[in-house]
Amino acid sequence: MKILIISQYFWPENFRINEVVKFLKLSGHDVEVLTGEPNYPKGEIFKNYLSEPDKYKEYFKAKVYRLNARPRKKGSKLDLFINYSSFLYKSIYFSLRKLRKKNYDIIFTFGTSPVTTSITSIILSKFTGSKTAIWVLDLWPDIVFELNIIKNKFLKKQFTNLMESIYKKTDLILAQSLKFKQNISEKINNDAKVKVLYQWPEVLEDNSEDRNSDINFEQKDLNIVFTGNIGTAQNFEHVIKVANACENLNVKWHIIGTGRDLNNIISLGRISKKILFYGLRDKSEMLNFLNKADVLLISLREGNAINSTIPGKLQTYLLANIPILGSIS
């Protein structure tokens, strides 16, 4: 099949859509990708990309179209609004100019927040005659309502109507959990076109050279490891409170990752010396962190949409065969 994948995030950024593209190409499909310039999560375009952009025009022989949408920058509400809007506008403009005469069988949207990226898929499909599919990884806009990112009642109604319209106009909806499927099916009164596609464990390299020279994992301690995004949904202020309460115990908390809430968390006040922040690390280092952990941590804020979410890291944690500590409903 000839497949166009539309995703705001793509290699060299670390998202599972990279593995989807690789799998489809190795399975013999003709795949193209429409994406932005890599800048997640720090909001700055990757230096390697800027110095040699031609190296990022193909991924496992899949052609990659790059849009110069505005980066996330500091990740404020305004920054993210401009970032999302910029990508949506430029993806519609580019696809109608360059891709509308292509005979795609499927236009597939990688549905991270906000799922408005699928608007491009729906519009383009009217010209190409393609079927459309979306993999929904966030129950947007429900999740931003629960996090109080959007409070205005008029905007809430408009975004809710927009999302329901997107679902109804999409041919196949893949939900990341059974509760996602139930939620979406009820909204559009159509169970048949909503299927479940769970996330899978990340493919982690075995870094036998042990490049993690700065890891301070002492055998006398219970070493708790968290990997991934530190955003509003992760409820990290609660994690910090618990860690501070355990300060007199032989427990260390190793936080690998970054996110828009990291600076806010650090500015909350006293943070135990037993909470160690490693920042953003290369994917090739993750296996060493997991192998040295005694316990792996998952944390999510409470809410109906959030409670329906299966964090992507859970499958990877399960594969590590290490106890998991969850602050999650």
Can you describe what each PLM-predicted range is?
Residues V20, T116, I123-T128, K153-I173:
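Membrane-proximal helix-turn-helix segments that form the acceptor-binding/catalytic region
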Residues D221, N248-H254, L262-N288:
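Nucleotide-activated donor-binding/catalytic signature segment of Leloir-type glycosyltransferases, i.e.
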Residues N14, L80-L96, I106-S130, I134-L137, ...:
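An aromatic- and histidine-rich active-site surface loop
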Residues E37, K179, L197-W200:
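Carbohydrate-associated surface elements
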Residues Q234, L280-F289, D294-L319, I324-S329:
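Nucleotide-sugar-dependent
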Residues M1-E58, A243-C246:
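N-terminal subdomain of nucleotide-sugar transferases
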Residues N216-Q234, I240-A243, H254:
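Conserved donor-binding/catalytic core segment of Leloir-type glycosyltransferases
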Residues S185-D191, K195, W200-K220, N235:
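Acidic anion/phosphate-binding donor-loop and adjacent secondary structure
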